[in-house]
Curated annotation (Swiss-Prot):
One Pfam family it belongs to: AraA_N
Superkingdom, taxonomy of origin: Bacteria
Lineage, opening ranks: Bacteria, Pseudomonadati, Pseudomonadota, Gammaproteobacteria, Enterobacterales
Binding site for Mn(2+): E306, E333, H350, H450
Pathway: Carbohydrate degradation; L-arabinose degradation via L-ribulose; D-xylulose 5-phosphate from L-arabinose (bacterial route): step 1/3
Biological role: Catalyzes the conversion of L-arabinose to L-ribulose.
EC number in record: 5.3.1.4
Protein name per Swiss-Prot or TrEMBL: L-arabinose isomerase
Keywords, comma-separated and alphabetical: Arabinose catabolism, Carbohydrate metabolism, Isomerase, Manganese, Metal-binding
Length: 500
């Protein structure tokens, strides 16, 4: 069972009574056939549920109103099978607060050249019925997604499935609670921001809990539960000599397990699915949570360090979006560069907290090493290299009057040398189009040093996310040129300034 099993998408057919009951009967039959086929064959992430035909303003308004109040409904897919006068949709679309996709399709793929008549033409009017619907969306300044293609086309299936992931993620985000253990890292700007504005825009709430509250739960974990979890560590990871039974750092592993169990219990009891920590606020914890955070991220929790609640929420959102897809998604930080002509590289990592979902296939190493930051006992962590291939890094920043999503397309590469003295998980990549352009563009656009790194999602996914939440997106990829990029930032400033 995945998070998508908690939601459904409603399939709504637009028509009218002008064509008579026989035409509406055929429309209903076609709709039932298409929905059944899509649910059976299209490999969609969640179920399509066919709703009654929308043939009058009252019927359409009722469907939209019901969608708003049904928590299982993640969004609407609308098919204009015949011509459906768009003024009938105004009241419904005015109140609709769920994502909307217009499936611009028709029941038949090929025209029946020898038998086509006006009855056929009146029944299969997507070509201009869809345009009428598109006009009212543009007139109402309501942007919605559009997918064109026959309902049996695999590319159309993939695009609908991708949109469904966004719709479910948006609905889930409305219930997302972010827990900050402690506050923001002192004096850091980009990790701060307006939590009220974020809740208005995205729906997630952000609140702080004292580390002492967490410590109470951690200390309540039984030794039996700790030992059982450490047994799991033994089977899942390659333990260094220091972390094995009778090893000099074995107690640190036991404490890390206790912290993991305590954090998970605290998060479950509070209904949290994202959280932050900061090394400046660890009072009562014996070590900075490293292993615990890594494993919780792998289980689907959002996380970011230093109180960075925006990145923690974004990671959770992207975890939901990518559920079931190949590749992982993790908290990340651009840490240091390798400058070499024609082979500039970025080494990404964090103090400890990189998600094992992006790791290469061999078992991660579980080790305990000294950490100079935080002033606590040496923390346990998983050490691994990252899978290679195309990926993205994304950053969500608060500009005061709006949110900006930055996305850099990257190519993850194999680490060319061993890193015997670097005891943390890491990722190595080439930034597109090149490191000077990518880094300068990122800095000019105000991108954070914390990002969400993903092999599972791509630029199109993030474009859909930005459109669905009506936020600015700034893209850095192989097509980026700095003069045009700077112009786009200036144009966006004017555009969003007019919208205030």
């Amino acid at each position: 069972m995945t998070i998508f099993d908690n939601y459904e998408v409603w399939f709504v057919i637009g028509s009218q009574h002008l064509y008579g009951p026989e035409t509406l009967r055929q429309v209903t039959q076609h709709a039932e056939h298409v929905v059944n086929a899509l649910n059976t064959e299209a490999k969609l992430p969640c179920k399509l549920v066919l709703k009654p035909l929308g043939t009058t303003p009252d019927e359409i308004t009722a469907i939209c109103r019901d969608a708003n109040y049904d928590d299982r409904c993640a969004g609407l897919v609308v098919w204009l099978h015949t011509f459906s006068p768009a003024k009938m949709w105004i009241n419904g679309l005015t109140m609709l607060n769920k994502p909307l996709l217009q499936f611009h399709t028709q029941f038949n793929a090929a025209l029946p050249w020898d038998s086509i008549d006006m009855d056929f033409m009146n029944l299969n009017q997507t070509a201009h019925g869809g345009r009428e619907f598109g006009f009212i969306g543009a007139r109402m300044r309501q942007q919605h997604a559009v997918v064109t293609g026959h309902w049996q086309d695999k590319q159309a299936h993939e695009r609908i499935g991708s949109w469904m992931r966004q719709a479910v993620s948006k609905q889930d985000t409305r219930h997302l609670k972010v827990c900050r253990f402690g506050d923001n890292m002192r004096e850091v700007a980009v990790t701060d921001g307006d939590k009220v504005a974020a809740q208005i825009k995205f729906g997630f709430s952000v609140n702080t809990w004292a580390v002492g509250d967490l410590v109470q739960v951690v200390n309540s974990i039984s030794d039996g539960d700790v030992n059982a979890l450490v047994d799991e560590y033994e089977s899942c990871y390659t333990m260094t000599p220091a972390t094995q039974i009778h090893g000099e750092k074995r107690q640190n592993v036991l404490e890390a397990a206790r912290i993991e169990l305590g954090m998970k219990r605290f998060l479950e009891q509070g209904g949290f699915h994202a959280f932050t920590t900061t090394f400046e606020d660890l009072h009562g914890l014996k070590q900075l949570p490293g292993l615990a955070v890594q494993r919780l991220m792998q289980q689907g929790y959002g996380f970011a360090g230093e109180g960075d609640w925006k990145t923690a929420a974004l990671l959770r959102i992207m975890k939901v979006m990518s559920t079931g897809l190949q590749g992982g998604t993790s908290f990340m930080e651009d840490y240091t560069y390798h400058f070499e002509k024609g082979n500039d590289l970025v080494l990404g990592s964090h103090m400890l907290e990189v998600c094992p979902s992006i790791a290469v296939e061999e078992k991660p190493i579980l080790d305990v090493q000294h950490l100079g930051i935080g002033g606590k006992d040496d923390p346990a962590r998983l050490i691994f290299n990252t899978q290679t291939g195309p990926a993205i890094v994304a950053s969500l920043i608060d500009l005061g009057d709006r949110y900006r999503l930055l996305v850099n397309c990257i190519d993850t590469v194999k680490t060319p040398h061993s890193l015997p003295k670097l005891p943390v998980a890491n990722a190595l990549w080439k930034a597109q189009p090149d490191l000077p352009t990518a880094s300068e563009a990122w800095i000019l656009a105000g991108g954070a040093h914390h990002t969400v790194f993903s092999h599972a999602l791509n630029l199109n996914d993030m474009r859909q996310f930005a459109e669905m939440h009506d936020i600015e997106i700034t893209v850095i990829d192989n097509d980026t040129r700095l003069p045009a990029f700077k112009d786009a930032l200036r144009w966006n400033e004017v555009y969003y300034g007019f919208r205030r």
